[in-house]
Amino acid sequence: MIVEVARVLASSKNAIAFTGAGISAESGVPTFRGKDGLWNKYRPEELATPEAFARNPKLVWEFYKWRINKILKAKPNPAHYALVELEDMGILRAVITQNVDDLHREAGTRNLIELHGNIFRVKCTKCNFKEYLKESQRLEEVLKEDLPKCPRCGSLLRPDVVWFGEPLPREELDRAFKLAEKADAVLVVGTSGLVYPAAYIPYIVKESGGTVIEVNVEESAITPIADFFLRGRAGEVLPRVVHEVRRLLQ
């Protein structure tokens, strides 16, 4: 089946990738409901909502600092790099991700749409200030503060991620949907397909006549519409697919 998938991609002009937590789990990024005891006693709804932040911003920031420190130790894995290779070959138009861990960017993905934000970006709760902490060199400073403040207006900063009950960023979602409408193939990697509206993406590709290729360790909500289901870890499966694509294009 790897050969058949490679054939689809090799002849594709407008493929996209749609990625979820599974691709990052292989890099050691803890999933939200991971087994780390420290935050297990809290439900995600108690930490990742606007209400939780209004009630106890210090606790929410402690949780996000813990996550940031965990993610800083993670490195992109072969699956991230395989997607970069497909982009370099001119096959992949964009990577649309539900992940906030910045690993696609670190791997070298150029056209990246982050539907759920980025944990290394902060935004002000009052004014329109935003900052990508890896670029501004202020990451260490922010991690040391109990309650990071906006350098422009002094109000509280918050992580620039989408919390439960918040809408997805309109611009990113529109871009993602437009790409999906034009896509002739979508690589669905490591997502449960349960979080909407992001999970509409494979369905849009399917309805527009494109091929749905799923790479996952287990079947998901997307599997019933997948034309190809490659069972396995993305870090093992995707490099094999890319190798085959290269062979076909030689």
UniProtKB/Swiss-Prot annotation:
Binding-site residues for NAD(+), renumbered to this chain: 20-39, 98-101, 190-192, 216-218, 234
Cofactor annotation comment: Binds 1 zinc ion per subunit.
* SUPFAM superfamilies, sorted: DHS-like NAD/FAD-binding domain
Instruction: Tell me if Ribosomal protein is a UniProt keyword of this record.
Output: no
- The top EC class is transferase
* Residue ranges of domain Deacetylase sirtuin-type in the record: 1-250
Q: What is its EC number?
A: 2.3.1.286
Q: What are the protein's GO molecular function terms?
A: histone deacetylase activity, NAD-dependent; NAD+ binding; protein-malonyllysine demalonylase activity; protein-succinyllysine desuccinylase activity; zinc ion binding
UniProt-listed PANTHER family: NAD-DEPENDENT PROTEIN DEACYLASE SIRTUIN-5, MITOCHONDRIAL-RELATED
Q: Which family does it belong to?
A: Belongs to the sirtuin family. Class III subfamily.
Instruction: Spell out the protein name for this chain.
Output: NAD-dependent protein deacylase
Q: Which organism is it from?
A: Pyrococcus abyssi (strain GE5 / Orsay)
